[in-house]
């Protein structure tokens, strides 16, 4: 409800979460895992820069993954009338992942909303996209090998195209009241000309 991604426009959100310190952290993580990250980039056709940026935004490169027991979080949230079905489905999926042995229930600490690992996957995302990339018969999203491969697999499967722009300059219909377009206008006015 009170998460900044819901009340800050994209430009403000990204600017507040990027710094030269964070850039240095990302470069250090890349240099320590260069072979793995390059292999995953080539296999899944997802840029290493995108994966590192997402990990930096989501968990500060794995240094803050959350401390909440996500089983308890999801059980509690499943009683919240606003999104009861969503969180109940996530809870059931998590229980199925535990029962099947795909995830270790002792490691399931993450966000208050039930997200887990270096890239903050919800249980349904784990179920649909996470990979046991190191072949140890467990999906460990707090391990760089499984985490990067799972993030790349997720992005690839939802349609990410390497070296294609993710934003396009658009012409806004002047009949649409600007109060509905503020986030779009604020972001696109500064960033649309800078797409890669």
Enumerate the predicted regions with their spans.
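Secretory-pathway/luminal and periplasmic proteins that interact with or process carbohydrate-rich
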Residues: 1, 59-68, 80-84, 101-106, ...
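Acidic, glycine-anchored loop motifs typical of Ca2+
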Residues: 132-141
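A structural motif
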Residues: 95-104, 113-133, 158-164
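Short, functionally critical alpha-helical segments immediately adjacent to catalytic or ligand/cofactor-binding
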Residues: 1, 47-62, 94-99, 151-152
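Substrate-binding/active-site groove segments that recognize
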Residues: 69-78, 91, 115-131, 151
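Solvent-exposed, acidic/flexible segments
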Residues: 23-34, 43-44, 63-67, 80, ...
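Single conserved hydrophobic/aromatic residue that forms the stacking wall/gate
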Residues: 187-196
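An acidic, Gly/Ser/Thr/Pro-rich helix-cap/linker signature
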Residues: 1-32, 38-41
